[in-house]
């Protein structure tokens, strides 16, 4: 709440670039500024100083003069908040996913195409179109909500703790879906997460926040091996890397592994 006794600075001197086509993760302890940074990237709030731009278009206060450019830039960023299934409200899966494209003023034929495509992207069967979203499982409802964002055809997909509350199977399906979107659709993904394991598995670059400042940026494996940075951000390395370090100390070189299965396969190969 700006200009009130409750106001405080959430981010300090943050300067960074989210590269197109890259899978970027943002991590930090509670209160580090992750959610504020996410809202700035999506144009939901304005910085008190500095600028946020999407593909070279500054996201500022909308005026009649800049409305079209600003609107176009905002549509390039799709936002998925924590527990997005809580935002479902239409009577059918189809109508919920179609809500965004219709509000973009698209013809109904294009709305139909986008709904079908986004359902395929999140692995929702087309027979679900006329079902109530509230009759689906928790994981299916979340995928329906994400499909509604994908139907807007964003260039950048920003997700805040997208796997929160999911069971192991739902978590695996969601992370696999994000990896497929990134790999096969060249979609730029920004993942805000408390799970260092998810970040190690999925992200190409990690931005580390502490006390509202960027304290590290680089390949997740490099960041996680930097104990000084992790201590500064009050985080711990993924269990897999800590396990790998212990295994290397007893004579098995495991190198860089993103999953337990990769590590197991590597150890087995060294024994042959």
Residue ranges and their predicted role:
Residues 27-29:
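The feature captures the beta-strand-to-loop junction immediately N-terminal to the Walker
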Residues 42:
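Helix-to-loop junction immediately C-terminal to a conserved catalytic motif
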Residues 50-61, 73:
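Conserved ABC transporter NBD signature motif
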Residues 109-127:
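Conserved ABC ATPase "signature" region
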Residues 132-136, 140:
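Conserved ABC ATPase signature
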Residues 149-150:
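ABC ATPase C-loop
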Residues 153:
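Conserved catalytic motifs of ABC-family nucleotide-binding domains
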Residues 157-160:
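Catalytic Walker B motif of ABC-type/P-loop ATPase nucleotide-binding domains
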């Amino acid at each position: 709440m700006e200009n009130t006794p409750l106001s405080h600075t959430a981010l300090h001197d943050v300067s960074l670039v989210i590269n197109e086509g890259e899978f970027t993760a943002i991590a930090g302890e509670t209160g580090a500024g992750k959610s504020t940074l996410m809202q700035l990237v999506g144009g939901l709030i304005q910085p008190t100083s500095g600028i946020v731009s999407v593909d070279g278009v500054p996201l500022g206060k909308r005026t009649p003069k800049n409305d079209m450019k600003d609107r176009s830039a905002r549509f390039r960023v799709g936002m998925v908040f924590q527990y997005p299934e809580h935002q479902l409200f239409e009577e059918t899966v189809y109508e919920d996913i179609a809500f965004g494209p219709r509000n973009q003023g698209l013809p109904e034929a294009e709305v139909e195409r986008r709904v079908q495509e986004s359902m395929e992207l999140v692995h929702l069967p087309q027979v679900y179109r006329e079902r109530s979203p509230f009759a689906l499982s928790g994981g299916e409802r979340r995928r329906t909500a994400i499909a509604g964002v994908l139907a807007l055809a964003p260039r950048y997909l920003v997700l805040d703790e997208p796997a929160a509350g999911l069971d192991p199977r739902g978590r695996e399906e969601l992370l696999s879906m994000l990896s497929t979107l990134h790999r096969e659709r060249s979609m730029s993904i920004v993942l805000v997460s408390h799970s260092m394991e998810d970040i190690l598995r999925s992200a190409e670059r990690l931005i580390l926040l502490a006390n509202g400042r960027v304290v590290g940026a680089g390949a997740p494996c490099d960041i996680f091996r930097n104990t000084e940075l992790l201590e500064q951000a009050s985080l711990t390395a993924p269990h897999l890397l800590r396990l790998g370090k212990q295994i290397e100390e007893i004579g098995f070189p495991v190198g860089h592994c993103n999953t337990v299965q990769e590590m197991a396969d590597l150890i087995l190969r060294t024994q042959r």
